[in-house]
Amino acid sequence: MFNKSLPGVLNTAKSSFALDQNSSEGEVMMTAMGQGKTTVSPYHMALIAEAVANGGTMMQPYLVESVTNYTGSQIRKNVPKSYKKVMTSDEAAQLKEYMTAVVEEGTGSVLKGRSYTAAGKTGTAEYSMSDGEKTHSWFMGFTNVDNPDLVISVITEGSDGSSRGKAVAIAGDILDAYYN
């Protein structure tokens, strides 16, 4: 799904990474963990989280579940449709287990004990070391782990090193507002 258009109605930038036969081992390692010349959008990260939540199947995204007119009659309803299988169900189950552990005992633990369960992945992308460490703080995940119903992806750009967990806190605020 890198270097390609993503499914759905949003016109987003392509996520990308740049490796070739001349790439050093260091560049390959940095790219493998999402650093280096890797670029990825929050939309793409939400699609990845959604595929994990759905047992490896990426669904065709849509923005609005249904539309009703002024009389309350439903005039359009989007029905979930499979887009493509992007990982095996065993791979998705393993990732779901890891992502649950991030919330239960790791860097996403600020989401533990809420009115919903969550699984997710936090991340920090460093982008400037010249005048102090500058980072992007990430969180992507899903809620109601046993029967997933909502996916979220948050990035805070241009943070200083002290706000590494900012994205997961913002995700918590958004999810709390949704569920409460």
Predicted segments, located by residue:
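Short, gly/Ser/Thr-rich active-site loops of penicillin-recognizing serine hydrolases
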Residues: 74-81, 168-180
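Short beta-strands and strand-coil junctions in structured, solvent-facing domains, enriched
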Residues: 160-162
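Short, conserved glycine- and acidic-residue-centered signature motifs
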Residues: 41, 164-167
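Beta-lactam-recognizing serine transpeptidase/beta-lactamase-like catalytic domain environment
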Residues: 1-156
